[in-house]
């Protein structure tokens, strides 16, 4: 993982954000890699902001800018992710697995706008790409916004996205989960 430049935007492993554990803003240079690593009992939702990322498990999918990949680790897997020729900037969002006994799976949603199907009832993800001068109204929830020169994470009650860029909103069942008590 020595190619990785990572900034942790949010950690909530105490259950205060329901199933959401962490959001990381990751950057890899062209051909850079996370290195082979394991996951178990976690769902990783990767939102590619720029560049591309090849997933080294399953079908070896390439996830491009604007795509959302959902990795359900379930019973566990080892994998690697490698940046394409243009490098990659990706928001990696980690959620406690909705079904830790399920076999691992991986799917890619190509360029979604609006709600992304995550296959779980305790977390919903809304995605938009806001162009300069465009007005987009986001739903209430935890807003993650990548503007021209910053990434912000803030709880908001819904309304206009404040600046151009990639916007995500997490709606989470924040009732304190049994594992956090």
Model-based region annotation:
Residues 1-181:
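Jelly-roll (double-stranded beta-helix
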């Amino acid at each position: 993982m020595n190619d990785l430049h990572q900034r942790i935007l949010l950690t909530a492993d105490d259950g205060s954000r329901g199933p959401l554990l962490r959001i990381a803003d990751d950057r890899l240079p062209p051909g850079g890699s996370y290195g082979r690593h394991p996951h178990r009992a976690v769902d990783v939702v990767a939102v590619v902001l720029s560049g591309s990322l090849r997933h080294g498990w399953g079908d070896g999918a390439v996830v491009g800018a604007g795509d959302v990949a959902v990795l359900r680790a379930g019973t566990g897997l080892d994998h690697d992710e490698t940046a394409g020729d243009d490098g990659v900037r990706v928001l990696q969002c980690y959620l406690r697995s909705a079904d830790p006994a399920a076999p691992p799976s991986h799917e890619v949603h190509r360029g979604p706008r609006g709600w992304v199907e995550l296959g779980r009832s305790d977390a919903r993800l809304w995605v938009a790409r806001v162009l300069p001068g465009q007005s987009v109204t986001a739903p209430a929830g935890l807003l993650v916004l990548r503007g021209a020169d910053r990434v912000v994470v803030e709880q908001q009650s819904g309304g206009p996205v404040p600046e151009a860029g990639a916007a995500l909103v997490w709606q989470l069942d924040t009732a304190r989960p049994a594992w956090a008590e």
